[in-house]
Amino acid sequence: MYMAIEHAQMRATLQARMGQGERERRDLRDVRERLLQVLEHGRIVIALQPIVRLADGVVVGHEALARFPLEYDLSTGRWFEDAARTGLSVELELAAAAAALARFASLPPETFLSVNVSPETACSDRLRQLIAGHDLRRLVLEVTEHTPVDDYGRLNQRLSALQEEGVRIAVDDTGAGFASLRHVLRLAPDIIKLDITLVREVDQRPRMQTLIAALLTFAQGTGADLIAEGVESPRQLETLKQLGVP
């Protein structure tokens, strides 16, 4: 009797796992279909976030931020996470980049446009085809750290080729963790962007100020520009100015 009960429990567990696996596959199909619908119908909207020089308040550039249909009630990060799960990362990033580049001509000629790309997309020949024909001296490619880099040699080769054509390379979320610092050390970016968590508490925590000062020294020593992301209060602004952030 005990053996029969044990076998019944094993069957129930196996059936539950099979059912869960089927649900996960069905959910993944639904997610992929949602992404394909957005891609096919061009439903990505771009919001341009001004990048301001702290010294004089002049807008020097714009970061292109992708926005997706509101009816799905999903964050931007979730859309890109879903794209990674379904093998559509490069397609979604290129679509967002294309939507951003469509706004390029409307920007003041003295400003630059910053577009987010993953290491995988940065290595894509399709990206080079997409940006061809634009003023590459005004284009910044912001390499995200959300996916691991398998081959820094290949990534460096691709980024160096883009830099030779005038594109500037930025590293996002610097100071957020080891991955971003490794990006800075391995990629030799033209622009280093401070993680928003450092900026958020810069006027309250001396250690944050010390870290930002160290990153500023590093940036100056390597010929890179430093950008503080997410400045929201006058106290944050004044503290960053005192630290020498441009």
Task: Go through each PLM region and give its residues.
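Signal-transmission/dimerization alpha-helices at domain junctions
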Residues: 1-14, 82-86
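Signal-transducing coiled-coil linker
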Residues: 6-7, 13, 20, 24-27, ...
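Cyclic nucleotide signaling catalytic output domains
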Residues: 13-24, 78, 82, 99, ...
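The cytosolic transmitter module of two-component sensor histidine kinases
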Residues: 24, 28-32, 93, 127, ...
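Active-site core of bacterial EAL-family cyclic-dinucleotide phosphodiesterase domains
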Residues: 24-82, 171
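Catalytic core of bacterial c-di-GMP phosphodiesterases, primarily the EAL and HD-GYP domains
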Residues: 58-61, 88-157, 230
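Conserved long alpha-helical elements within nucleotide-processing catalytic cores of c-di-GMP signaling
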Residues: 77-81, 90, 160
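The catalytic core of metal-dependent phosphodiesterases that act on cyclic dinucleotides
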Residues: 130-202, 218-246
